Each structure stands twice: as structure tokens, then as C-alpha cells.
Amino acid sequence: MHANDPTPAPLADPLSVEHAVDLLATMAHPVRLTVLSWLYRRGPASVGDLGEALGVEQSALSHHLRQLRDRRLVVAERDGKRVIYRLDDDHVGCIVEDAIRHAGERGAGEVADG
């Protein structure tokens, strides 16, 4: 619902909410969120390239990429001996970038009273 639209929007169906929770839970790790942001901003990359750029060991990064791939947030494609990762679609990058931008607007370490 928007401020100038008095008609309430319908609630999301429970299955969609459950899938959204799973998607957000998978993203909710600093390495995975950074990987998704990097792939959105810079495009496809190999595990080695990502590890070097992000300062993450290849074994740890492979574990995180497997989780992202299992949830269909990234796609892996073989290119000779290398495996190249890319976002499954741009919606993933938009969600990540919006979350990062929103957090930045709120200020580091700021916690809302609730």
C-alpha cells in the first residue's frame, strides 16, 4: 500500500513468504552477500578470481558458492577447466544492492528501538 492509495495490497501467500525467508537466510552471511554484490557489479567470475578479489580462501568460498547455487541464486558454468559463476538473474543483485544501500542509509551499528 502506498501513502496515496487507500486500497490495501493483498498479503503474500504463505509459500511465497517461506521461499523469501529461505532466500534471505541464504544471503544473510557476509561472504555470500559480498559475493552476490560483486557478481552483480562486476559480472561472472571464477572461484579463484572471486577468492583473490574478496580475500577469501578457495575452500571456504566454494562452500558458500555451493549454498548459493543450491538455492539458485547463482549459476555455475564450466569454461574449460574453470567454473564460472554468475547471478541466476538480476533480481538477486537488486535485492542485495537495495539491502546494502538501505543499511548504509541507516548508519553503521544503528539499532532501532523496538
Q: What are these language model-derived features?
A:
Residues 20, 70-71:
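A generic local structural motif
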